[in-house]
Amino acid sequence: MNNGLGWASGRKSWLALPLVLVAILLAALFSDRAGFRPIDWENYVLAADRLRAGESPYQGVEFFAPPWIAILLIPLSLLPIELSSGVWLLTSAAAAFSATLLWTRFGSFPSIPRSKIMLSALTAASPVALYVYVTGQITALAELALISLAVLVGLSQQRRVLIPTVIAALLVTAKPHIVAFPLALILLQSVRARRWKVPIVFGTTILIAAVVSWVLHPGWLGEWLAGLLAGQYLGGPGLAARGYFGLREAGVPGILLWLPAGYALLYWIRKGLTASALALAIAGGLTLLPYLRIYDHLVLWPAAITASGLLRAKGPRSFAAVPLAAMLLLPLTDLAMLLPPLIVGMLLVRVTLGSRSAASN
């Protein structure tokens, strides 16, 4: 029976291929006609072009990802920017949709298939996602890679991990600062559960990618670190949003911003890699960051969905809409920086109350 289902699933995938190709073509034509050229996507393409020519992808370019991201983008950089922008837009939207769909599987909320689809569509059309599309950022692919690794490690029935882990390892490091903490817990969980394939493949992939990058441009490591430490991403020339104002700039003591991540670590030690633990790690990791753009808040959607599920399960159903509404509304205001601690607070309230209720029973 399983073989038949697998064959049928594979056949459906092949039948969907023409539709995917048509969608890519339409997206490319749209960007060509509309003159759609996101500023960060232009920087990605320029970095890929320079690396292909043996030059530095960092000097004079607002590119802060590891060089293997530029290597992966070389095929798209061969296209005219007007066409590749549309393909990138479609890729980002598909990644944002797929990341939420995967998360609903990992977190088992919502349970109704139609609700999963609707929620995935909502996140892919949310303001933070639109910021990703307009700027041409790679955040959606980093989010999808992070959730994919969580599924590979957290769901024991996964068998084929080589290719998914390789792809996820390359993409998740595109935005290392926003995924570092939850990624660390995912890899620690794989070691804790003695599922050695994921961390071994992950580490080997990054090592090979670093070596290949060194062959193409030996000085990449020093240039990448120099670019990160220079801090031009805090509002350098040409960025879509100049300057930066976050929680630290608002006067919040730095030590307080580390507390959610500390609690998430302790919760993971006690409970393992549950949806709540990873949601706390995502929100806590974003809270402690000294730098976070609006488009980076896309990674916060899984935590908001988990908070919504907990509120619905352990309180009035109307409360479940609060984290989702916050994700839809706050990015449209100057209060977007409050999103991570707000989601952390909702998670902590429900997780803490749930733990006390279980203890009393």
Describe each region flagged by the PLM:
Residues 161-187, 281-289, 323-329:
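Membrane-interface alpha helices of multi-pass inner-membrane proteins
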Residues 308-361:
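Aromatic-enriched
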Residues 2-156, 160-163, 188-316:
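Primarily membrane-embedded glycan-assembly and transfer machineries that use lipid-linked glycans
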Residues 130-141, 169, 174-181, 185, ...:
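Helix-loop-helix junctions and helix-breaking kinks within/between transmembrane helices
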Residues 14-15, 178, 296, 353, ...:
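Sequence-pattern detector for short linear motifs
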